[in-house]
Amino acid sequence: PFWALLLASNLADFVWLALALAGPEAPVPSSLLDASLRGLRVNMPYSHNLLPTFALALVTAGAAGAIWRDARGALWCGGLVLIHLACDLVSGFEHQILGERSAPIGLDLYRRSPHLALVIEAAFGAACVLWFSRRGAVPRRRLIALYAVFVGGALLWLPTATIPLGRLFGLRG
């Protein structure tokens, strides 16, 4: 199902959010109002590092295959978990191979050039929606919604690339 592909493509972030709330991968600063992409510090050894992501992809593919009995769909679900990591290595935070002390990988554009990172994410989102729409008839409303979520969703964060949300809305000094 389409929703399963959307879930798989963002599963690492959902795992990170759960671990951030539980504590092991808590960001600094902890309040969304005090954070900008450039100023946010994250350590995601369980949700985003290379080896744990491969494990998450295998579990995701296995679960999808067991639930829907569709090998192709299962491979897509597992593959989307890995594609998420690949995209993060280009435009997201720096990650490591295994843990805090292992070699860093990725361009770390959220810290080094957050505006560029968000534009790259929006362009990738547009390319994915275009590719998806060319594979079959997509109702106009769904197409608009997909562009809004994947392109608009990335561009929406441009103001917070370097300015914390609380300062943008006058809630913090």
Locate predicted features.
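N-terminal membrane-targeting hydrophobic helices
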Residues: 1-173
